[in-house]
Amino acid sequence: SLYNACPQALIADTDILARAPMRLLQAGLGDMLAKYCSICEWRIAHLVIGEYYCEDIAELMREALRRVRDAAPGLAQRQPEAAEQVAQGLILAGIAMAFTGVSRPASGLEHYFSHIWEMMALERGLPVELHGIQVGIGTLLSLRIWEDLRGITPDRQRALDFIKGFDEAAWEAMVRRIFASAADSILQTA
């Protein structure tokens, strides 16, 4: 993520937002619902590796999520109040990232899925879906992964054996096969 200055003002006409194409409303909702996962992952990162975490910001996002969740059925009826809650939630997510200096309050594994799909589509010259739609799908995949992880008992020896047997050349070949010309920049940051 790159730091950008916050805007001086935002103007959003909720009547216009409520009349937006339904796919755009769904994308906004998809991006907002992802915050359930991102806030949990942020807390886990704090507990496991000591990453910066702010409970006040996390609670700000949880409250925005509650309002979006409660208003979500109104999006189908194009209620301006529902569109307002989604817009406010997305704005608060941006503010939360600006306050913390990291994207964690608003972005987790689900966003990685979206970014990978975007890179792969760009590499192949294919169209991409709306960011919030992709993030919504990434949220469903993330939840499935989290559910699978609940059934795993950590095994230190197995992890150490995996590290010993890690084949960096095979991993690099896989990255190059999947990401083609984007692989060099990915490998440089790995």
What kind of region is each of these model predictions?
Residues 1-66:
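A glycine/threonine-rich phosphate-anchoring loop and its flanking beta-alpha core
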